[in-house]
Amino acid sequence: MDGTNGSTQTHFILLGFSDRPHLERILFVVILIAYLLTLVGNTTIILVSRLDPHLHTPMYFFLAHLSFLDLSFTTSSIPQLLYNLNGCDKTISYMGCAIQLFLFLGLGGVECLLLAVMAYDRCVAICKPLHYMVIMNPRLCRGLVSVTWGCGVANSLAMSPVTLRLPRCGHHEVDHFLREMPALIRMACVSTVAIEGTVFVLAVGVVLSPLVFILLSYSYIVRAVLQIRSASGRQKAFGTCGSHLTVVSLFYGNIIYMYMQPGASSSQDQGMFLMLFYNIVTPLLNPLIYTLRNREVKGALGRLLLGKRELGKE
């Protein structure tokens, strides 16, 4: 357990809020409710997108994948978090930590790239409306999703092993409640300059590059919308992008605030609460944003519910 290399460890201890049991009990209830709502909301989006023929379009194809990502992302960490919050056992096995880190890096990378793909989809829909279904054909949509998953997995395969193999000189206490990569790097008893440089390069490719692409896509969208003469037409065009833009702002705003500010300017508690927001609140809000702001999704939900009622009457 106290070997000099991370690969010989059998477990890690997630300290989290273990020094404040009263806070753990409150967090357990709040996180459990949020997790259940996340499961219901994202599962509903997936089912509605697949069952309603009116939603068999590229936009909802990508939205279903985003909901699946959110489901996978929360399920990869929240059950373990709830287990640790509910009892005295704060440990996580080395293998469990490795799996969680791999999923965290992989799914996070996929979501960054998928949001960029969704921005491109909205750009084509507004800038090339007459050619939209030709350009965004099923083959291209499947190809784009496959590329995002491939890049996310490659990013995780590149970063997870080197992070887990860092020598920790017997240290196995993680000052966090999740297997966050920066927390694992801080445990190392050797220089981490090389791995931090690698992390920065990969972050530019997987996180910042999609953000730049999203901003460029929306610059084309804004220019195209401003050329629409009618106010109702402009409002409708902006409305089709509103939900996606809100999700992008929520996702990237949280990442930038967590990782781009100086370490001395934020406390450990603040960092942990931000990570909670990133892992729980964002996946919870995504289906609400798309449902509340989207008439097509609300209409599809209504049709499915009415259909079930009619079948029940028969």
Curated annotation (Swiss-Prot):
Keywords on record: Cell membrane, G-protein coupled receptor, Glycoprotein, Membrane, Olfaction, Receptor, Sensory transduction, Transducer, Transmembrane, Transmembrane helix
TM segment ranges: 26-49, 58-79, 101-120, 140-158, 196-219, 237-259, 273-292
InterPro entries reported for this sequence: GPCR_Rhodpsn, GPCR_Rhodpsn_7TM, Olfact_rcpt
GO biological process: detection of chemical stimulus involved in sensory perception of smell
UniProt entry tagged with the keyword Glycoprotein: yes
Recorded GO MF terms: G protein-coupled receptor activity; olfactory receptor activity
Entry function: Odorant receptor.
PANTHER family: OLFACTORY RECEPTOR
Name of the featured protein: Olfactory receptor 2W3
Organism of this sequence: Homo sapiens
Lineage: Eukaryota, Metazoa, Chordata, Craniata, Vertebrata
